C-alpha cells in the first residue's frame, strides 16, 4: 500500500517530543535523521540521543487526512502555527520483496561471506554467516558495515572476546564468532535488535557464545580484546570515554559510520588512549582502528 511521509526539521533537544506528537496524531512509525552525520539515524546504545539539526519523519497511511494532522500539530507548543514541514507521497512497492530480491551473498576479505538465509552459499568451505536481519537492521550492503567486516576478517580472533557496540542484526558479533572469537557481546538500545541478533546467532549455531544486553542493562565493568562500533560520527565522539574504556590494554578498537571528512574529529576523541592506524576508506565513508595504549 502507498504511504505519506511527513518530515519536520528541529533541534536534537526537541526531536523526541515531536516524534511523540507525530505518533499521537496518527503516524504508524517515526524515525530520526541526523542531517549532518548520516542519511539514516541509528539510536545510540544506552539512550536515544539526537544531535543539532535533526529531521523527524512520520509515516502515515495513504488515506490519512494530512490537513487535519497539520492542524493538530500546530497546537503543539514546540512547533507553533507556521512550522516548516514537507509532505511526500511514497511509491507503492512491495518493499520486503524488493529488499529480498536485491540481497545477495557478499564476500568480505579473504574468508568471510555474508549470505541471505534463503539463498545457497557460494562457497561451502568459506566462513559463512547466514543472515535474515529483517528490514530494520544491517545486512553488510552499506560501506560502513563492509569496512567493519573486512577489518574483522583481517584479524586473528582465535580465543578473543569481541564487543559489538550497537549490534543491530548481530552481523558483526556473529561474524567475529564464526571467524574464531570465543565470546561476543552485543549491545543495543532496541529490543528488536536484540531479538534479531539472537535469531541470527541461533541460525548460525553460535548463540551459546553470544551475550546480548539492552543498553540500560549493560554491566559497567565490561572489557574485551576487540571492540567494534558502527554507529555515527557524532555519538562516536560523544561516547569516546565509554567506548574507549571497553578494550583491554593492548586491545583493538574499530569505529565506523563515519564520513571521510569527519575522520579527523573522531580520531581526536580517541588519540589519548589509542595508537591510531591509517584510516581505511570506501566511497565517502571510512573506518578508524587502533590499539589501546597499555598503562603502567
UniProtKB/Swiss-Prot annotation:
Methylates ribosomal protein L11. NCBIfam families: prmA (TIGR00406). One of its GO terms (molecular function) is protein-lysine N-methyltransferase activity. One of its GO terms (biological process) is methylation. It comes from the Bacteria. It is found in: Cytoplasm. Its EC number is 2.1.1.-. This is Ribosomal protein L11 methyltransferase. Pfam families: PrmA. It comes from Photorhabdus laumondii subsp. laumondii (strain DSM 15139 / CIP 105565 / TT01) (Photorhabdus luminescens subsp. laumondii). One of its GO terms (cellular component) is cytosol. It catalyses: L-lysyl-[protein] + 3 S-adenosyl-L-methionine = N(6),N(6),N(6)-trimethyl-L-lysyl-[protein] + 3 S-adenosyl-L-homocysteine + 3 H(+). Keywords: Cytoplasm, Methyltransferase, S-adenosyl-L-methionine, Transferase. It is an enzyme of class 2 (transferase).
